[in-house]
């Protein structure tokens, strides 16, 4: 864990500081650098998980639950890896992932925030295209300095998570902008009937959409 943390900090600080003399800025002037908001504690949260998992047919219900849970787990892992690749970072920057959400420690730079914003938008467009409004990803972050990560003063570390939670809650309350709502209302569906599993209008095979068919097929292998 220590090595992973050191690797995470080594990959983050240079993006913020942009210096060559790190001995001067981080060690000799350590106290000053501890107060600089060099980091972003960032989180992504997939909402709609419970409804998605428990939207299953009566036949093979247990396998269906496992398949949908596994699918969401793998999806989050892929999302994390894709975002880290866009940021030119490694999984050393991943603090936690599980249960449809994750936490990452990133550099607090304009470039990082731009990448995060664009990725969140593109990800939710993809979610809408494949799952309509069933799944949505809300993201949030808090700017942090080294002292806050050390919980100095006491309570400052938990305050970071409260800030993130508030940002994510606000986004969940206002999921879509006007353009996305217009797109939803004007979309032409491929099919005319509802999938008997997820109730989404789509092109069906055996009364099931392609997503539900694929998950049903996968359930036999896990």
Regions found by a protein language model. Give the residues of each.
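Regulatory and interdomain segments flanking nucleotide-handling catalytic cores
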Residues: 1-222
